[in-house]
Amino acid sequence: MSRYRGSVCRQCRRENMKLFLKGDRCFSDKCSFDRRSYPPGQHGQRRMKHSDYGIQLREKQKVRRIYGIGEKQFRIIFKKADSLKGITGETLLSLLERRLDNVVFRLGFTSSRTQGRHFVRHNHFTVNGKKVNIPSYIIKAGDVVELKEKSKKVQAITDSLDTVVRRGVPQWLELDKDGFKGVVKGMPAREDITLPIQEQLIVELYSK
């Protein structure tokens, strides 16, 4: 899957919201979005009118960027959500939240989803005592996500855990900070996902 290699701060400005792609920097006064909260480019400060399709497309792109997922993989996740019982849009967000790279970020082990993806791939975590190095692995209720013994001294992880109080942990997860592990207490409900996402726009886009 191809990866965006430009400035991640430009992505926040493009979507007109903080995507929290740079960890602690997003919470500091160094955040580019706080200083320039308008789209990048020569005409960024002009007000643009979008068609219904354009609005739907922007919403999909925003969610893709939040979770760091390419178009092909995002479409696969949407099809899975559409095939399951329940409201498609809410199921889509639940699947995205339950990705392992997102869960380790939500638990506070990493400062961003990008860093979470990196550490998962490099075998820093186990799920129910077994090695899992696939960022897209879908976590289930009752699963225990634990940091490997050798990884407990990784500075980036300990630094991130020190800021977890400020960021907070969702109600569907429980962090044992001293034990370097987290428990999935249940499935994420729609109200647990506080990002300004209009998932119905994505459903409408893919229904065309």
From Swiss-Prot:
Quaternary state and interactors: Part of the 30S ribosomal subunit. Contacts protein S5. The interaction surface between S4 and S5 is involved in control of translational fidelity.
* Entry GO CC: small ribosomal subunit
According to its UniProt entry, what is the function of this protein?
A: One of the primary rRNA binding proteins, it binds directly to 16S rRNA where it nucleates assembly of the body of the 30S subunit. With S5 and S12 plays an important role in translational accuracy.
Q: What residue stretches are annotated with the S4 RNA-binding domain?
A: 98-168
Does the record's keyword annotation contain Ribosomal protein?
yes
Per the record, the gene is rpsD
Quote the SMART domains the UniProt record gives: Ribosomal_S4, S4
A single GO BP term for this record reads:
translation
Q: Which UniProt keywords apply?
A: Ribonucleoprotein, Ribosomal protein, RNA-binding, rRNA-binding
Q: Which Pfam families match?
A: Ribosomal_S4 (PF00163), S4 (PF01479)
Name recorded for this polypeptide = Small ribosomal subunit protein uS4
Query: Which PANTHER family does the record associate with it?
Result: 30S 40S RIBOSOMAL PROTEIN, SMALL RIBOSOMAL SUBUNIT PROTEIN US4M
Q: Does the keyword Ribonucleoprotein apply?
A: yes
Molecular-function GO terms, alphabetical? rRNA binding; structural constituent of ribosome
UniProt similarity note? Belongs to the universal ribosomal protein uS4 family.
